Amino acid sequence: MAIPPGSYKLGPENGKMLVKTGREGMGGKMGHDLVIEVGRWSATADVGEDLSACSLTGSADVGSMEVVSGEGGVKPLSDGDKAEIKKTIVDKILGDTKIDFKSTSISGGGSNATVQGDLTIAGKTAPAQFQLQDLGGGRIKATGQVVQSNFGVKPFKAFMGALKVKDTVDIEIEATVPEA
């Protein structure tokens, strides 16, 4: 990674965090693949001379999640649908909590790195892995997948289980690294 050593603060002021869901089941065509933006999140990247001296911590506020789009489905998502999805996430699935991450190791080389660490969702901690890419010009991108059931989270289902949110969700963060 070409980011100079230092401590960097990331969040909505210089980046975007997205959660992307898919759907499955016999009624899957009725639902939507969602893109959810996390409005309140923060991360600190401590960058050393080499990857072994680097660390990453982050936190995301579940209550700040907003559905920004939904692909597929029988009908387009209305603003009311989006509000109901948020209410379900906060009230029935995750609670109005924080999601936390703390790296345990960072490896790789060039413009790519693998960040491994402990992810805590709904009070349960499990290992997680994210791919970090230096996009150039001070831009970075982190991607990873989270299996909800690894954290005791039951993916949403409707129509007696005929429509389900896939257990695996995609996480994507893109940010501009501020000056150290």
Q: Could you describe each region identified by the protein language model?
A:
Residues 1-180:
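Low-complexity, acidic/polar, glycine-enriched regions of mature
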